[in-house]
Amino acid sequence: MEDVREGVDELDRELVKLLAVRQGYMEAAARIKPTFDDVRVPWRVEDVVTKVLQSAEKEGLSGRIAEPVWRELIECCIAHEGEVWKKLRSE
C-alpha cells in the first residue's frame, strides 16, 4: 500500500506543477482581456469541458471524475483570473 501512496503523492506533485502553469495562462489572459465581462466566456467553458472529456475517454479516465473536476478547476481559474484582472486595473 505504501508504494501506491507514494505513487499518488508523486502524481499530486506533478499535478501541482501543471496547475501552476495553467494559472500562469489565466494570469496572462487577465492582462490581455479588455473588460471584466471578457473574463467569463461561457462557450469557452463548454469547449474546454468537451475537449477534456474526449481526452479522458482516450486515456481511460472516467467522465464522472473528469467533468466535475474540470468544471471546478475552470470556476476556480475564472475567479482567480477575475481577481488578477481587477488588481491589474486598480494599480
Task: Give, region by region, the residue ranges found by the protein language model.
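Domain-level signature for soluble enzymes in the chorismate/prephenate branch of the shikimate pathway
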Residues: 1-91
